[in-house]
Regions:
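Peripheral, non-catalytic segments flanking oxidoreductase cores
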Residues: 1-322
Length: 322
């Protein structure tokens, strides 16, 4: 009797891709991965070990280990300092001390590609500021935002709707979230983050050497995410699913902790300031309209108030489904 092989998350080499020379087959490869898995690993491993550089400019070179080292003193700050990380937007501020998720602690930096956004966060955490932290986080956010923009443009081009990309790009805002998962004690749950889909357009996740992230396939398999060196997990969120008229898959994912090491993770989450519309080109006889136009941050608020927030349930369909 044979055994079915467990599927693997696609890995796509991105190191040599520039927005000006992206070819059709590469665009289709990215689109197909997001349609079938809802995610893929963007591999930039042509660079030196531990160093990521998506441009020709020195300031965009990032040493990932240095980024994670900078998170440790941040999370070591007193709780009364960390809770100053607030926002009127749902899931944009401090999250922690939750009885049903005792291992997780997280903070959000809004408008993370701008000096003002990062400075506002840093000044709230450190009374005298923290210039080194500021520079590192903003550089990281800028680098990953370029990856996000490239991926988004590739999908738009693959669907033949690239004419909408520039106007969409003008409405993008980036939230950077830093996350810390402590190892569980003997009697605690190993669940660091419950199964959920992201409410974003696109999410891009990295982690330190401690594993734990799992992604659920359409067939119900939980796949452990194995990051190649110098790679990013690119994941579609519910807003991307709706924009694509249900072509792109928004996958469930979770964190399950093992061992006795702390896990640090960074996510860049893309939101749209305004109304998201399904392109008319993506509506036809084979793909009847499944979603109405919707306000992205309105959807985030809707989800935050949904009593079914912790269930595997299509929240975006409830919000704006036809």
């Amino acid at each position: 009797m044979g055994f079915l092989a467990q599927p693997n998350i696609p890995v796509i080499k991105m190191a040599n891709m520039k927005q000006t020379i992206i070819n059709v087959s590469a665009c289709n490869e990215v689109r197909h991965a997001l349609e079938e898995y809802g995610c893929f690993l963007a591999d930039y491993s042509d660079d030196d070990d531990g160093i990521i550089n998506t441009t020709d400019h020195d300031e965009e070179i990032i040493n990932m280990m240095e980024v994670y080292d900078a998170l440790k003193p941040l999370f070591d700050l007193p709780i009364e300092t960390k809770v100053k990380n607030t926002s009127p937007k749902a899931y944009h501020g401090y999250v922690g001390q939750l009885p049903f998720l005792p291992l997780l602690e997280s903070m959000g930096i809004e408008n993370a590609t701008s000096a003002h956004g990062v400075n506002s966060f840093t000044n709230a955490m450190w009374s005298s500021g923290n210039t080194d932290f500021c520079k590192m986080i903003q550089s990281y956010a800028k680098l990953v935002s370029k990856i996000e923009e490239t991926v988004r443009k590739m999908v738009f081009e693959s669907y033949g709707v690239e004419k909408y990309h520039e106007s969409y790009n003008e409405s993008v805002t980036y939230l950077l979230r830093v996350m810390k998962y402590r190892p569980p004690s003997m009697k605690e749950t190993r669940i660091g983050s419950i199964s959920h889909t992201d409410k974003t357009f696109i999410s891009i996740l990295t982690q330190n050497q401690v594993k734990g992230l799992q992604v659920k396939t359409k067939d119900g398999y939980w796949i452990p995410v194995e990051y190649p060196p110098c790679s990013f997990l690119v994941m579609a969120g519910d807003a991307f699913k709706a924009w694509s008229n249900d072509r792109v898959h928004s996958p469930y994912h979770r964190v399950v902790m093992e061992g006795d090491e702390y896990r640090y993770s960074i996510g860049i989450f893309t939101y749209h300031k305004g109304i998201i519309q399904v392109p008319e080109e993506l509506v036809d006889e084979d793909h009847p309209r499944k979603f109405n136009s919707f306000d992205h941050f309105g959807y985030l608020d809707f989800y935050a108030k949904d009593s079914l927030f912790d269930k595997e349930y299509c929240h975006i369909n409830s919000y704006c489904g036809v």
